[in-house]
Amino acid sequence: MRSKIEAGDYVRPCDGERQSGDAAFVQFQDDGVLIALVDVLGHGKAAHVLAVSLTESLSKWLREVRSPSPDAALSVLHEAARGTRGAVASVAWINATTLEGNVTGIGNVRCRLFGSAAKTIKFDDGLLGFRARSRMPVSLALMPADVLLLFSDGVSERFDASQYPTLTLDPAPTIAFNIVQRFGKGRDDASCAVLRCKP
């Protein structure tokens, strides 16, 4: 599996803060990989603690299920966020053999695909822990060298491959770092989680 898919993430707190309210989650399973990006409302330590707690809820859930789905994972996050300040998130699952899967989300965590076909996926408004209307997962069929990005609203969505010519060539951790460093906004927590299908 790891020979076909690689993953990476990078999280940077906003200016003046030492901890971020964004958190990335990557978990390789026997047949694929689940990747998630969580953006808690607010900044600083309290937001960071909640973001970590939410990703830990995903980790615990994955120990109990055989076939995870992004929609079920988002429901886990929604329940874990009840009684808190709330968060937005996106979750994707990719099968390691077929490179097919799906992605879903709530709120303004973005999803973009680069490589064989450029695609931008936006999600309905909402807030985990408060209001989360039913979601229809978006199907994905990736190809070798395709790159799937999940990124928070602390990263500008107004960039394209011409501004990052080696986007589909770099290792996943390098891509995540470069997306945040090049296109991140200093006034907000910025984060990016990456799945890259190797050529």
Question: Which residues does each PLM region occupy?
Answer:
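N-terminal entry segment of metal-dependent catalytic domains or homologous docking segments
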Residues: 1-56, 131-133, 137-139, 188
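Catalytic core of PPM/PP2C metal-dependent serine/threonine phosphatase domains
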Residues: 20, 48-117, 135, 187, ...
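Small-residue (GG/TT-enriched) beta-loop-alpha framework at ligand/catalytic clefts
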Residues: 118-130, 170-172, 181-184
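Sensory/regulatory domains in signal-transduction proteins
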Residues: 13, 32, 100, 117-124, ...
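Short Pro/Gly-enriched beta-strand edge/turn motifs at strand-loop
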Residues: 4-10, 72-75, 174-177
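Acidic loop->beta-strand submotif enriched in PP2C/PPM serine/threonine phosphatases
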Residues: 17-33, 86-89, 120-160
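C-terminal catalytic subdomain
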Residues: 77-78, 144, 149-199
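Active-site metal-binding loops of divalent metal-dependent hydrolases
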Residues: 39-41, 109, 153-154
